[in-house]
């Protein structure tokens, strides 16, 4: 890829004074991935009227949207017991302007590659957490006239739904339109910094997501697996291929005839089985699948529209490789479906109560860079599959038209997978998955041959 020249870095602060003070975070904000999640948008050459002022439009509208989403302009601050809070101090977000001698056509199919790194603002997690911006953006102008925009958002502050809420409102303000949905900022609705109200706890506590994922048989840790070289691929599934998979899953004895399996349950079950085959596990190898659930509509009452924060939790489906491979697709899909159905209002409250009672939350946090031997790891023999199927991820328009491609920036941890809706919105999907290089060819073979 052609070299990139970084022209200038700006600190963007809210355009008007905003509330300042210490902002308690909910338990779901403080566990799991608390690093930044990058998303990339690619645009064709803007029309002549936008040629000289793309950067200014982005900066000005970003400053304005931060007035409404002011927590994003603050900084995290560590507290005792592995907790942290948000210091709403309006220190601002980072905006980088860069140029490339390359062309957008150099990226071919836009699969995440190491070349994407220079298009994304980098975060040094060795710096004190109090100094790290929670939102970073980089606009890169290419020689062909096209541009890329990378947005890197702290997962300690928001989940994907909330991040895209902010980004879409940024686009609306840039186009001269009013805010569509005012963010709901009060995290006390999830008892942030407060005790839970009394509730009846079911007799069985089964939050497997707080347990250590299985190791390979014969291993006592995952240190060696973390070191192995990985590769990311984007694998499309057409609507007809999806229909074949769903027919397979729903035709099994494990299916509920009244409901059937969802796209996510079906595709994720297929991915899980294919990964077990590709990795060459022994039949008795335990394997866990991490599933990310949006709890907004599962709470009683549901969280308010525009809730701005983390409202997702991870649940786990578990089996052995032998069970998954010897049984039909419907078996894997049924394990996933059952894990998802377990997420009720009571389940969420039990999880919050459990975390509130922990002496230290650090063991549940992932603030570690690629190559680290610390933090949660859902690589071999495990997987984590996240759905972006219902996220409003397409159509980000700042005035010069919608992007022609958007997708994840990087996804370099073994076992990490995303299921994305295809950009043509015809019901087809794309699997973005990262596996060890040694396993990928076999995985791709099974992924398509087993449909």
UniProtKB/Swiss-Prot annotation:
Gene Ontology biological-process annotations: pollen development; pollen exine formation; spermidine hydroxycinnamate conjugate biosynthetic process
Superkingdom of origin: Eukaryota
GO molecular function: N-acyltransferase activity; spermidine:caffeoyl CoA N-acyltransferase activity; spermidine:coumaroyl CoA N-acyltransferase activity; spermidine:feruloyl CoA N-acyltransferase activity; spermidine:sinapoyl CoA N-acyltransferase activity
Null allele phenotype: Glossy and sticky pollen, but very little changes in the exine patterns. Drastic reduction in flower buds of the content in N1,N4,N8-tri-(hydroxyferuloyl)-spermidine and N1,N4-di(hydroxyferuloyl)-N8-sinapoyl-spermidine.
One Pfam family, short name: Transferase
Active site: 155 (proton acceptor), 397 (proton acceptor)
Enzyme Commission number, as recorded: 2.3.1.-
Binding site for CoA: 160, 262-263, 294, 298, 387
Keywords: Acyltransferase, Transferase
Amino-acid positions noted as binding spermidine in the UniProt annotation, renumbered to this chain: 33, 155, 314
Tissues with expression: Expressed in flower buds and inflorescences. Restricted to anther tapetum.
Expression induction: Not induced by pathogens or by wounding.
Keyword Acyltransferase (UniProt): yes
Top class in the EC scheme: transferase
Family: Belongs to the plant acyltransferase family.
PANTHER family associated with the record: SPERMIDINE HYDROXYCINNAMOYL TRANSFERASE, TRICHOTHECENE 3-O-ACETYLTRANSFERASE
Chain's role: Hydroxycinnamoyl transferase involved in the conjugation of feruloyl CoA to spermidine. Catalyzes the three conjugating steps required for the biosynthesis of N(1),N(4),N(8)-triferuloyl-spermidine. Spermidine is the only acceptor substrate while feruloyl CoA > caffeoyl CoA > coumaroyl CoA > cinnamoyl CoA >> sinapoyl CoA are efficient acyl donors. No activity with hydroxyferuloyl CoA. Required for the biosynthesis of these conjugated spermidine derivatives, specifically in anther tapetum.
Name the UniProt record assigns to this protein: Spermidine hydroxycinnamoyl transferase
Record organism: Arabidopsis thaliana
Gene: SHT
